Every structure is written in C-alpha cells, then in structure tokens.
C-alpha cells in the first residue's frame, strides 16, 4: 500500500531520519522528519498555474506546534489550536528566509509549505528540523527549487561550540545561533549573543555551516529517488524587452536615482513606471508581454543603475560612500508621562521609543510545548503605514513586525539587569515614525536610549546597524547603514547589534549564492566600526543609566517570608490579600518560595501594604510589649488582639497589680491597653499580662524579625511555639525597604 522511502544519518550523536511515501501522499511534497522523540510532518503544495499580475513569489510558510505533541490540551475556552503564537510566527520566518531566494526568479505560482510538530522532544531542536523538512518537501515537489537548504543550531559553552544544544544547555550558553545554507553558501544567520567578538561569531557560523553538510547529502539522496518532474520555467523577461525600455527610459531612471530624497526619488520612479506601462499597453493587451515581465525588466534596469554606481564609482544613491553612516539625531525624555522615552533618527529612518515599568503580575505568560513560563522583558515593534507615506489602515501586528521586534529584543536582552538588581517587568514599545532602511536597528538604538533615561541599570549602551552587499563576479562592495532601495536591489541584508565590547544580536539574509566567509569577515568588521560610530553619537546625549527612576514609575520592594506564612497572607479564598490590595492600592505577588513582591504607584501606598503584611507574618517574642485592643471580656479574663490578626488571653490575675472582683470592672470591649507577651499555652495560644506592662520598654515600634531563619530552642516548654517560628520580618529586609522606598535607586 505504501511506497515509503527513508534516508537517515547519524547527526551529533542522534539519528536524523527523513521519509516520504506514507503520510500526506497527495501533497506535491511530503516528508516526515524524525530525531529522538520529535516527529514533524512537512508538506509543500504548488499551484498548477502562475498567479497573474504580481511581481513576487507568493510563498506562504506555516509552522505549527500541536499541543498533543507534548501531551497537552490547549488552554483557553476553545480547546483547540488558535492563531499562530509569536514563536510559530518566528519559526515560520526562520524557514522562509533561507528558502525564498532559491526559487527560479520567474516562478510566481502560489506555494504553501506547512511544518507541523506532531511529537515533541525537548532534547532536539524542532525549529532546525522544520527548516530541514521544508527544504526536503520542496525538493520533492514540482516547484523550481534550485538548491537544497539545511540548518543547524550552535551554542557556546565553556569556550566550546556545541551543535544543536538542548534547551537546558542553551540557558548556560553565551550564544544561540541558527545558521542555514546550501552545500556551498550560507544563506541565513539568526542569533542572540552575550557580547561575543566578530571573530567568535564568524567561527560559530563556520562551525554550523560545516555541521549541516551531511544533512544536505541525505536530502539530495531522498530527492533523487522520490522527486516529481519540475515545472519548466522560461526567462524572467525577453532580452529585447529590457533593451527597448533602456533605450526609451534609461536617462529618466538615472536622473531619478540621482535624487537624494526618498520621497522625491520614489515619486519620480512611480511616474516613470506609469510611462513604461502606458507605452506597452497594447503589447500587454495582445499578450506579447505580461505585466510581470515588464515590471521585472524595469526593476532589472533600476537595479543595474544602482549597483553600477556603487561598484564602479563608489557612490550611493544618496551621495554617501560605502562606509558612511547617515546623520544621527538623538533625543530623550520627550514624553513626560512615560517612564522613559527617546527619539532616534538616522537619515530618513526614525523610531519613537517608550519604556514602561510594571509588576511581576504584568509579565507576559507564554504557553509553549516546553511548558508555561513568563517573560519580564517585552519589546513591541510597530510599523505604521504612515512611516512610508502609505494610505492604509492599521492592522494587527504583522509577521514582519513580530520578527523585527524579536530581533531588537535579542539585541537588548543580554544587557538587561536581572530581577534581583531590578525587580520590575519592562515593556518597550518602538514605533517606526519614518522608514528608509534599517528600522529594526533604529529600534535597538532608541530602546537603549529610552531604557537608560528611564533608569534601568543596563550593562552598556547598545546600537545596531544594517549592512548591505552588492556583488558582481569577484567584484563586491559592502555597504554600511543601507537604505531601503539598497536593501531591495542588493544581495544581502546583514544586521548587527551590540555594545562597544561585543555583539548581542546578528541577523543575516543572503539573496545570492557565492557569498563566502571572506565577504562576511569584511562585513562584520565594517559593521563594528559603524556600530562604534553610532554609539559615540548616542553617548553624547546619554552614556549611562540615570540613577533615579521617573517620578511616574511605580515603587516596589521584595521581601522574604516563611513559606508557612503564605496562606496567612492570602487568606481563605484570597480574602486577606484582596483586602490588602484594595485598602492600600498596591499589588502583591507571592512566589512559592516565600518571596513577596509589593508594587504601588507611590511609596505611601507601598508602606501601607508592607505594614499590613508585617502585621500578618510577624511572630512576636516573649517579653515584648504591644498596644492591644480588647475584643472580648469573660469572667476569667479577656481576649486581646495584640498584633495583626493575633489574639491572646489575659487571665483575671494578670489584669491588674491589685485584686479585682470582675474583669468587666476594669476592661471593656474596644479598650486599648498595653500588654506584655509572657508565653504560650500547650495549644500555642498567647498568654498576655497587663500588670506592669507600661513600666517595661514598649516594643511596638521596634523592627520585628522575619521567620526565615528558624531555630528550635527546647530550653523552656512555654517557648516551644516561639522558638519554632521566630518573628516574620528582619532588619536586613527593612534596611533594604527603606533604601528602595526613599531613594528608589538600583545598583548592579
């Protein structure tokens, strides 16, 4: 029934298996990828006819993580997979980027690739397996997929490169790098790094490139046995068409490219495009030329003009040399109500960035195959249509926005303080207000400025730069700080972010084959010099974090209590903690280990909440004096609330130094009296005395101690209760609280 074909290779100590012919047999290409306990199904479907009237490849990549793959049922009201998560979007883009440049340039058939995780093993990198599976499925399909791609993940642990590190190993790794490519070229790099040098990054890319070569071999073997006939493709456009357009319009196009303003240049190129289509309108109607052929020929002419100016004259369309950086302007604190803000402008690219502090309750909850976890740092990249002068409605975040935001997140994350140094959650919003190339790197620069102005103790300022490449044969030029047109017509988009010491993020997309490590080395060094120049300009405005937070920032502190006291603070059904929050206006977050984080809009509200928590968790010591409130009077004595929610009993003999006939003759409900704790009965109930209490040192204003460091003392039976639970506060915590509340400063 099944004609299954399987190829396998031992890769990094695990067997990687690719098979086809058993599952999804009606798809143009279908490959099952297995490694460890991970199983992915990758399919490729190609439309029979080309899509008319478009000038790009309509390729859609969908990566899906099925909940059942990890033995889970989806959360939420509807118990099924919903819209793609950010991770699914990011992996979809990761698959798309190395694959898209490898199709025949004239191919415009609708193409869909789906990669589904059916079984999940945390010991295997499923994103890498998805890239491999997608490439294999396309190699089996009729699509004119010209070369085969594979990928690998690289970590750096204890100075050694690690191939396909597990999630556990990545937590201790200085590098998380994905590299994809063909048998002779790197096509894509995506990484987060902890201040690594250019040499280390280049060696990591080489290591990853060499590591996936055995995988390319088995994909080729599978394709040789199971591939379907490829679609026959013609030239993108007739050579005669290009010659005719050049003859009629090349001078006008050259004049348009001589205009340094993006708006002016774009307007004139649009007018020329209209003229070209008007000239060929009869040819389009007679189907001599298609709309796509004319557009492609025109773009080829524009590309040739731009590339020739760079390679032959070392001159770019805005007049810069290949290494020049556009003019930079930085401004901080321009949004008075934000906790931190900055405006970063580089040429015609501009990013308005704001920073907001929140509580641990504001952290982003992420539900993934690995399990649920929280992100305390969030970065949202927004690219509104007005930034490129387009009249379009605002929509939900696009895949591009999610991807650019994650790249900026990777650049900033390594230099952030940990939660002990800075207990807030952090949200950065970067809105691209103008765009002409490298808006994601403008986001990195603006985010660094806004964070420092907000008072976040980052390790060092971070800047980012986008590099480009123009290559013809052996002749090439690496471009610093590329424009949008240079990105579109160029051969590489190479983004590098980092501090003065090293790289924190790197993303590279190459559109052609033959880009070797020599070119990458030149690009990395040129990017380093450009990054240092940008940092120099940024440092003129702000070079280190402000010592104080914004007056609009919330106050916060973190204390430690006995885990046994957690239930007392929460109360039945959350009654107690809800009452504290409502009366104080603060927010409280309690961890299972007894860590209590308190947040409020100002220090007065914070103090109210802390006092209420203190009253609940305090464990008084024998001999302490308190202001107590009489809650009930009996013939034998009285119950008195002496601290927090704790009541003690005063026997009639302890009410007064003189003999009294009745307790009610001395005490009434609601009376406030000084009481002294003299011990506990065999049930742990407090025993109090009023006699001579006002003659002893009053202890209500002393700093109570926490019950974190419990010790047991069996010297006296009456003290067993007290010795098992010391006071639930400590002076170290109080000293820290005083500093945090009054100074609101944080140090590394």
From Swiss-Prot:
Binding locations of Mg(2+): 487, 493
Subcellular location: Cytoplasm
Region named Disordered: 695-733
Catalytic function, reaction form: RNA(n+1) + phosphate = RNA(n) + a ribonucleoside 5'-diphosphate
Basic and acidic residues compositional bias, start-end: 713-722
SMART domains: KH, S1
GO MF assignments: 3'-5'-RNA exonuclease activity; magnesium ion binding; polyribonucleotide nucleotidyltransferase activity; RNA binding
Domain KH: 554-613
GO CC annotations on file: cytosol
Residue ranges of domain S1 motif in the record: 623-691
Domain of life: Bacteria
Protein family: Belongs to the polyribonucleotide nucleotidyltransferase family.
Annotated function: Involved in mRNA degradation. Catalyzes the phosphorolysis of single-stranded polyribonucleotides processively in the 3'- to 5'-direction.
Annotated protein name in UniProt: Polyribonucleotide nucleotidyltransferase
Source organism per UniProt: Rickettsia rickettsii (strain Sheila Smith)
Gene: pnp
């Amino acid at each position: 029934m099944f004609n299954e074909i399987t190829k396998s290779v031992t890769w990094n100590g695990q067997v990687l298996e690719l098979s086809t012919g058993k599952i999804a047999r009606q798809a143009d290409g279908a490959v099952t990828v297995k490694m460890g306990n991970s199983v992915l199904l990758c399919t490729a479907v190609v439309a029979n006819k080309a899509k008319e009237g478009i000038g790009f490849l309509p390729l859609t990549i969908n990566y899906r993580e099925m909940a059942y793959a990890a033995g889970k049922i989806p959360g939420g009201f509807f118990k099924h997979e919903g819209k793609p998560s950010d991770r699914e979007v990011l992996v979809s883009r990761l698959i798309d980027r190395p694959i898209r440049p490898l199709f025949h340039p004239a191919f415009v058939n609708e193409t869909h690739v789906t990669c589904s995780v059916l079984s999940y093993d945390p010991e295997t990198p499923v994103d890498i397996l998805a890239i491999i599976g997608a490439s294999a499925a396309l190699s089996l399909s009729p699509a004119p997929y010209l070369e085969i791609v594979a990928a690998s993940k690289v970590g750096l642990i204890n100075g050694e490169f690690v191939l396909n590190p597990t999630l556990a190993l990545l937590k201790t790794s200085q590098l998380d790098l994905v590299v994809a490519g063909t048998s002779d070229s790197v096509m894509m790099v995506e990484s987060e790094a902890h201040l690594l040098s250019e040499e280390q990054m280049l060696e990591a890319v080489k290591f990853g490139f060499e590591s996936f070569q055995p995988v390319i071999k088995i994909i080729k073997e599978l394709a040789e046995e199971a591939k379907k006939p490829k679609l026959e493709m013609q030239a993108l456009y007739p050579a005669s068409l290009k010659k005719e357009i050049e003859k009629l319009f090349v001078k006008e196009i050259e004049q348009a490219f001589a205009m340094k303003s993006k708006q002016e240049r774009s307007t004139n190129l649009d007018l020329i495009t209209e003229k070209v289509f008007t000239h060929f309108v009869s040819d389009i109607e007679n189907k001599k030329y298609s709309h796509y052929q004319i557009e492609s020929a025109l773009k080829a002419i524009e590309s040739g003009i731009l590339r020739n100016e760079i390679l032959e004259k070392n001159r770019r369309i805005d007049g810069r040399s290949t290494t020049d950086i556009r003019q930079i302007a930085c401004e901080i604190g321009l949004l008075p109500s934000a906790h931190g803000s900055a405006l970063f402008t580089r040429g015609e690219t501009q990013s308005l960035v704001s920073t907001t502090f929140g509580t641990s309750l504001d952290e982003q909850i992420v539900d993934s195959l690995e399990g649920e976890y929280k992100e305390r740092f969030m970065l949202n990249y927004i690219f509104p249509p007005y930034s490129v002068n387009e009249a379009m409605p605002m929509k939900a975040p696009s895949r591009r926005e999610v991807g650019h935001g994650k790249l900026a997140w990777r650049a900033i994350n390594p230099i952030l303080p940990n939660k002990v140094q800075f207990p807030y959650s952090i949200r950065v919003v970067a809105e691209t207000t103008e765009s002409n190339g490298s808006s994601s790197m403008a986001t990195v620069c603006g985010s660094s400025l806004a964070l420092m102005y907000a008072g976040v103790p980052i390790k060092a300022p971070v800047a980012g730069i986008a590099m480009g490449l123009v290559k013809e044969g052996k002749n090439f030029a690496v471009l610093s700080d590329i424009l949008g047109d240079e990105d579109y017509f160029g051969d590489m988009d190479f983004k590098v972010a980092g501090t003065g010491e090293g790289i924190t993020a790197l993303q590279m997309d190459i559109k052609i084959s033959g880009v070797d490590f020599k070119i990458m080395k030149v690009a990395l060094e040129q990017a380093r010099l450009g990054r240092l120049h940008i940092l120099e300009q940024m440092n003129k405005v702000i070079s280190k974090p402000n010592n104080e937070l914004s007056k609009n920032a919330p106050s916060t502190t973190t204390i430690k209590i006995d885990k046994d006291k957690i239930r007392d603070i929460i109360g039945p059904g959350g009654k107690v903690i809800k009452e504290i929050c409502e009366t104080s206006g603060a927010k409280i977050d309690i961890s299972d280990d007894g860590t209590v984080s308190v947040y409020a809009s100002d220090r007065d509200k914070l103090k109210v909440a802390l006092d209420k928590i203190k009253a609940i968790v305090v464990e008084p010591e024998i001999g302490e004096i308190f202001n107590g409130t009489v809650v009930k009077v009996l013939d034998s004595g009285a119950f008195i609330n002496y601290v927090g929610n704790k009541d003690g009993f005063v026997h009639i003999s302890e009410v007064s130094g003189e003999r009294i006939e009745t307790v009610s003759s001395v005490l009434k409900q609601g009376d406030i009296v000084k009481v002294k704790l003299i011990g506990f009965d065999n049930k742990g109930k407090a025993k109090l005395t009023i006699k001579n209490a006002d003659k002893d040192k009053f202890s209500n204003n002393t700093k109570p101690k926490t019950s974190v460091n419990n010790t047991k003392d069996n010297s006296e039976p009456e003290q067993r209760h007290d010795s098992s639970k010391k006071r639930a506060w400590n002076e170290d915590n109080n000293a820290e609280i005083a500093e945090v509340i009054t100074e609101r400063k944080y140090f590394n």
